C-alpha cells in the first residue's frame, strides 16, 4: 500500500509543506479544490471564511480521481481558518471515510492553531490519527524550524 498526501491550500503555504512531505516520503499527492474558488482580497476571503466556519458550511469540491482503498497512510494538510480546519478540508473529511487508515495531520497558520488538529481527528472516526504538526507562517515566510518539520516527516515511516 502507498501513502497519499492530501491537502487544501488557499495561499500556497499548505501546498508548500505538502510538496516538501511528498519529496521526502514519496507516494501520491492530491490537492483538494472547491468548485467555486475563493476570490477577492485577502480580507474578503477571511470574512467569507469566518462566515463559512461559523455556519458549518461545506463547499462543493471538485472531483478527484483517487481510490482511498489503495492507501493505508494519509498525510492530510489544511490551513487554519478561524481556529479550525478550512471548510474545504472539512467537506472532504465529511464525505470520505478514513476509518482503518493511519492519518498524519498538519496545519498551517499565521497565528494560532486553535482546535484544528483535534477537529481533524474528530472528523476521522475509526482512523489512527497520529500527533499532528503545527506549521507557523508569517505571511509566506516559514517560522516553524526546519528541524521540527523534518523530525515530524521522519516519524511518518518509522
Task: Give each language-model segment a name.
Residues 1-76, 83-85, 90, 94, ...:
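N-terminal beta1-alpha1-beta2 submodule of the flavodoxin-like/Rossmannoid cofactor-binding fold
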Residues 5, 76, 105-107, 131:
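Structural beta-sheet core signal
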Residues 28, 128-131:
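Conserved beta-strand segments of alpha/beta enzyme cores
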Residues 71-72, 100-101, 127:
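Short, well-ordered alpha-helix to beta-strand connector turns
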Residues 79-82, 109:
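Short glycine-rich anion-binding loops that position phosphate/pyrophosphate groups of nucleotides
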Residues 94-100, 123-125:
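Short, conserved loop/helix-junction motifs that constitute active-site signature segments
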Residues 111-123:
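Glycine-rich, charge-decorated loop segments at or immediately adjacent to ligand/cofactor-binding or catalytic sites
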Residues 130-158:
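Glycine-rich phosphate/pyrophosphate-binding loop and the adjoining helix
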